[in-house]
Amino acid sequence: MSRTYAELPRLMTLMTGDEKHEPSATSTLDVLWVLYDRVLRTSPDRLDDPGRDRFLLSKGHGPAAYYAVLAAKGFIPESWLSGFGSADSRLGYHPDRNLVPGVEISSGSLGHGLPIGVGVAHGLIAQGLPVVGDRAPRVFVLVGDAELDEGSNSEAIVYAGAVGLSNLLVIAVDNQSSSYGWGAGGIEAHFAVSGWSAARVSGRDRAALASALSASGSGPRLVVAAVEAKSVEGKS
């Protein structure tokens, strides 16, 4: 049974493990909901469908919101949430693709999701999967702004732009936790110089997120989802 956005806080509170990385989880909640509710062409009955969209959570150290959304959309039972982080639970502090239905990659070590996403996007093109509806399957990668400090992302960004991976979309949740900042033009300029189209929206405006995440173009796309700074997350 698919649940509503209003039920996510209750689902989140069911996870009582010691290390939920709450700021990392709450910063991604709206993006994750919009993806699974309005954008991604995937569902619990399409886990092995070659034509499904792929979602890669590179920001894997804050999976509580991810698990809540997967439960809300029927990928995992709600009853799993209360065991979060326990020794015999499928729901670890980092998502495991071998244990959690719907999880495409095991993540948590930062800087891996975007390079993997480039490879997956390339692989889908190489397979020549047919267009269903108005587009072929796409790859969506969720990263954090601080994670982009990792050098492994730079090569992936340049390569994706150079070969024009139009089936790749990266969402960067910006809570101003990057070590060095981004200077003039922000994260968007860092991607745009390599041939990406880029947009910035509020990471709490679900309508704006849906519009930005549904857009497509002739090359890879970046959507920066700006949220409250990490130092003040959870405060009014």
Please describe what each predicted stretch is:
Residues L148-D149, S177-S179, K230-E233:
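Flexible loop/turn segments at secondary-structure boundaries
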Residues E150-D174, G219-A226:
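A short alpha/beta connector and helix-capping loop motif
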Residues E19, S24-A162:
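Cofactor-binding active-site loop characterized by glycine-rich and histidine/acidic residues
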Residues D30, H61-G62, N175-Q176, D205, ...:
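Glycine-rich beta-alpha junction loops
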Residues H190, S197-A199, R206-S236:
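Glycine/aspartate-rich loop-and-adjacent alpha/beta segment that forms the canonical ThDP
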Residues S179-A189:
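Short, glycine/polar-rich helix-capping loops at beta-to-alpha or helix-loop-helix junctions
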Residues R3-E19, A172-V173:
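N-terminal capping segment at the start of a domain
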Residues R138, S166-L169, S197:
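Residues at the starts of beta-strands that form the adenosine-phosphate
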